[in-house]
């Protein structure tokens, strides 16, 4: 009863307006050497869930992290989680995602008196909503558009994995400065029909 009472009141602890919530986030990465320092299998697993209260709409796309690597967070999609899906394409009260890639350093060379290497990282990403966000409201709004061909609020489809395939090229100087070029494609056209691409710095994780 004590735990139930605490969870029931957690939304009003901060502002009494229903914009407080208690959440849980787990993100773990693992790197497995396959062949010397030339080939590495790397993967990252993330789970984020809402325990109590209600997440405000303007915070629903936030992925919590202890180590700030990106300027912004964007739900599952874009360049910070599931590469190849439209930015903010998959959001919910709770989300889970997996990034898996092979990192192959295939060329070493010296240039301007610095050590460089080139690397490829073919990857497979996937994610899924594990807690829906205001699903009842989406269903209610869908009834108002029941006579339209494509419903903008609720498709009626059961949530499933959103997966992508892609590859990246890395130009690395002295092992600590990384220029990254990545391209990916969603395996379901509803997650994005065009080829996704991104130019930036560092590996994703």
Predicted regions and their residues:
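Transmembrane beta-barrel architecture of outer-membrane proteins
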Residues: 21-25, 95-99, 162-166, 176, ...
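Outer-membrane beta-barrel transmembrane domain signature
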Residues: 119-165
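Residue-level signature of outer-membrane beta-barrel architecture
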Residues: 30-32, 102-106, 171-173, 183-185, ...
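C-terminal outer-membrane beta-barrel translocator/porin domains of Gram-negative envelope proteins
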Residues: 1-114, 130-132, 151
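Short, contiguous acidic/charged loop-to-helix segments that flank catalytic cores in large enzymes
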Residues: 85-92, 149-160, 187-189
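Outer-membrane beta-barrel "beta-signal"
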Residues: 171, 176, 193-205
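Conserved active-site loop/cleft motifs that coordinate metal ions or position small ligands
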Residues: 121-123, 175-184
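Flexible, surface-exposed loop regions and adjacent strand-edge segments
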Residues: 23, 58-68, 136-144, 196-202
């Amino acid at each position: 009863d004590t735990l139930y009472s605490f969870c029931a009141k957690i939304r009003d602890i901060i502002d009494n307006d229903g914009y407080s919530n208690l959440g849980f986030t787990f993100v773990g990465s693992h790197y497995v050497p396959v062949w010397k320092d030339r080939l590495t299998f790397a993967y990252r697993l993330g789970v984020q869930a809402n325990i109590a209260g209600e997440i405000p709409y303007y915070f629903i796309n936030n992925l919590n992290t202890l180590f700030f690597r990106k300027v912004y967070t964007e739900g599952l999609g874009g360049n910070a989680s599931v590469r190849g899906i439209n930015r903010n394409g998959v959001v919910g009260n709770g989300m889970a995602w997996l990034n898996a890639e092979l990192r192959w350093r295939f060329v070493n060379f010296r240039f301007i008196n610095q050590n460089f290497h080139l690397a490829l990282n073919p990857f497979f990403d996937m994610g899924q909503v594990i807690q829906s966000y205001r699903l009842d409201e989406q269903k209610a709004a869908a009834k108002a558009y029941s006579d339209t061909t494509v419903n903008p609020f609720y498709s009626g489809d059961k949530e499933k994995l959103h997966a992508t395939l892609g590859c990246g090229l890395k130009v690395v100087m002295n092992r600590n400065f990384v220029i990254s070029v990545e391209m990916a494609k969603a395996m379901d056209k509803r997650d994005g029909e065009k080829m996704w691409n991104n130019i930036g710095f560092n590996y994703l994780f």
